[in-house]
Amino acid sequence: MLEIKELSFSYNKHKENIFKNLSVNFAKGFNVILGPNGAGKSTLLKAIFGLLRYQGNIYYDGVNLSKINFNKKIELISYLPQMDLNISPLTVLEMVLLGRLPELHQKISDEDIKAVTEILKALNIEDLITRTFSELSGGEKKMVFLAQTLVRNPKLILLDEPTNSLDLQKQLELCQFLQNFIKLKKVDIIVILHDINLAIRYADHIVILSNDGKLYNSGEAKKVITEKMLREVYGVSGNVILDDENKPIISVKKSIRDK
C-alpha cells in the first residue's frame, strides 16, 4: 500500500529534523497514526500529500509520489487537514461540490449533484444541503469538510484528527462510517487520532510515532498497544488486557509525567 523510505524533513535547515531517515509501511484499509503532540503526525500527512519538500521516497501502490505532478496526485489522494472552521457564504451543496470541481462556475453535471447527495446521505447530514456553511455548528462543519474530501472518490484518503469537535457518539459513528466506506469503495485511509481506544476498535493497522519523530512501533493493535508503549510514548501508567475479540482494553492509572 503506502511505503515511506528514508524520509527526512525539517521546516528550517537550521533546526533539528522532525524526521530523520524515517521508514515505515502502512497496510491496506484503515490505518491510524498515534503519538503525543509534537511527534510529527500532521507533518507526515503533509509530506505524503506533497505539501512539503523532503528527502527520501514515498510510494503508493508502487508509484513514487514525488515523481508525479500535483494534479495527478490530487486525483489519487484526498487530504483533510486540521483547519479553522471559517465563515463561508456558500451553501453546504456548494461547499461539497468544490471537492469535485476546482471552481463553481464550471458546468455542474447531474452526476456531480448525485455524488454530493449520496455522500451527504451516507454521512447522515443530507438535511444540511441547502443551509449556509457559516451557520453550522463546529461538528457539522467538520462533517461537511469530510464530505468534500470523500466526494471525489480518491484511492487514498488522509484525515488529520477528523473526530475533533465531535462528541463521543459522533466519533464512533464517524469511525464506523469510514470502516464501511473502505469496504464499499475499496479505498485506503490514514487517519490521525488522539483516542487510543478508537484506534484499537477500528484500525486494521496502527503506526505509533514517538515525540522525537521516530517510529516507535507499527502493526495490529494487540501487538503495538502495550503497557510499555503507554509509559514510553505517552508517559502514563496503565493496564492493558485483551477482550473477547483479542483486542486490547486500556485502563489508565495516572500520568508519570505529572509527578
Q: Regions from the language model: what does each represent?
A:
Residues D110-L128, F145, N153:
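Conserved ABC ATPase "signature" region
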Residues I157-E161:
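Catalytic Walker B motif of ABC-type/P-loop ATPase nucleotide-binding domains
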Residues K223, E227, R231-K259:
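ABC ATPase nucleotide-binding domains
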Residues M1-I4, S8-L22, A27, K67-N69, ...:
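A short, flexible loop at the N-terminus of ABC-type nucleotide-binding domains that lies
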Residues Y54-L65:
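Conserved ABC transporter NBD signature motif
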